[in-house]
Amino acid sequence: MAGQKIRIRLKSYDHEVIDVSARKIVETVTRAGATVVGPVPLPTEKNVYCVIRSPHKYKDSREHFEMRTHKRLIDIIDPTPKAVDSLMRLDLPADVNIEIKL
């Protein structure tokens, strides 16, 4: 797979879980003999939702909730077949969304 690059994007609501997953990916791929760039922290997406506290009246009383989406980017340059195989076998938490582009 000479001259190829694999780009992995991780998304999660918990920054600790995404950092552990990124560290696991980097360790696995470097052990298999490929070069890794990253993990690069991408900007955190923050969604704020405004909700009226009362079900019927008192519109001035509102409550704000926010959801933060943390993102990381990992590039694998010149991946070996062993690195790709070990990457496919890697067990990661369910709350981490993984996008892989070749």
UniProtKB/Swiss-Prot annotation:
The keyword Translocase does not apply. Keywords: Ribonucleoprotein, Ribosomal protein. One of its GO terms (cellular component) is ribonucleoprotein complex. One of its GO terms (biological process) is translation. InterPro entries: Ribosomal_uS10, Ribosomal_uS10_CS, Ribosomal_uS10_dom, Ribosomal_uS10_dom_sf. GO terms for molecular function: structural constituent of ribosome; tRNA binding. It holds the Pfam family Ribosomal_S10. Belongs to the universal ribosomal protein uS10 family. Involved in the binding of tRNA to the ribosomes. Part of the 30S ribosomal subunit. This is Small ribosomal subunit protein uS10. It comes from Arthrobacter sp. (strain FB24). The gene is rpsJ.
